[in-house]
Amino acid sequence: HVRSRRQRQMCIRDSSKEDQDACFFKAVAVAKQILENQIESANAVNRADEKVQQAYKNSRDGIVVLPCYLPWKNGLYKTDALFVIYPSQRGGWSAQCVTDHKTKKPKLPFPQSWAGQPQEVIEQKSGLEGISFCHASRFLITAKDKETALAACRQVLKNNGRL
């Protein structure tokens, strides 16, 4: 630490006032950009929350359908929503279980018999063609289309006496 402190002091003493001012204003520009990015990020989250709340108001049977992927967890985890369906960024559609705000566990997970299984096994066990993946922790599935994702969520609801 002593050596680096001395080096810094030498640089400060050896640099001109103009160099120090230039460095300061460069730092101000970087700090300004960071702050602007943080503000824009917060505004984007607020806009997403509004879209998520609108989708929740239009939901049925605890299944919320989003028009695109949006950060939805903050807006839904204290509601009675059970599933969120949205277009996957990788193609097809995804369905996720909403977690309980106290336990942080899925309110209604996908079946154990689907968990981590290959597509053929999931399709055979579910009777639904087009479910391509179920996470081993049972909180997420992927499907070929929105209708298949909806059907999978409805099947879970029905099998648990919720439909």
Where are each of the predicted segments found?
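Charged phosphate-binding loop/patch that engages nucleotide di/tri-phosphates or the phosphate backbone
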Residues: 15-18, 22-30, 159-163
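Single conserved hydrophobic/aromatic residue that forms the stacking wall/gate
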Residues: 1-12
